[in-house]
From Swiss-Prot:
UniProt note: domains: A Gly-cisPro motif from one monomer fits into the active site of the other monomer to allow specific chiral rejection of L-amino acids.
GO terms under cellular component: cytoplasm
Motif (Gly-cisPro motif, important for rejection of L-amino acids): 136-137
Catalytic activity: glycyl-tRNA(Ala) + H2O = tRNA(Ala) + glycine + H(+); a D-aminoacyl-tRNA + H2O = a tRNA + a D-alpha-amino acid + H(+)
Superkingdom of origin organism: Bacteria
CDD domains associated with the record: Dtyr_deacylase
GO molecular function: D-tyrosyl-tRNA(Tyr) deacylase activity; Gly-tRNA(Ala) deacylase activity; Ser(Gly)-tRNA(Ala) hydrolase activity; tRNA binding
Biological processes annotated in GO: D-amino acid catabolic process; tRNA metabolic process
Name of the protein: D-aminoacyl-tRNA deacylase
Taxon lineage: Bacteria, Pseudomonadati, Pseudomonadota, Gammaproteobacteria, Pasteurellales
Subunit structure: Homodimer.
Amino acid sequence: MIALIQRVSQAKVDVKGETIGKIGKGLLVLLGVEKEDNREKADKLAEKVLNYRIFSDENDKMNLNVQQAQGELLIVSQFTLAADTQKGLRPSFSKGASPALANELYEYFIQKCAEKLPVSTGQFAADMQVSLTNDGPVTFWLNV
């Protein structure tokens, strides 16, 4: 399971011209689910996202997690994170989870995160437009 996290000052996701999820300060989490993923991996990744220290403390050092920074999460499903790009000029999605498994683990991941923080979401399998202001920029690839 993969999370591409970006520290943002604001982010939103639109579907068919309508904003369905919006946050202020926090993390935009682009979530990719792979074939071998399960709830245990989702638990580990949620814990890592919630506790990863990428917000500045009073000394301007990355020392606070999103909870300590009183931030929010915008979680968006992104199957392309599971792409194999090692060969050729076209990505292969053979490592990606089936839509049923991906949706189940996406919803489970959202539920786990929502136990700790305000969460907004995208729409699974929809064509979405994601807008953000990356603060830093600060972006990390987390894989469990």
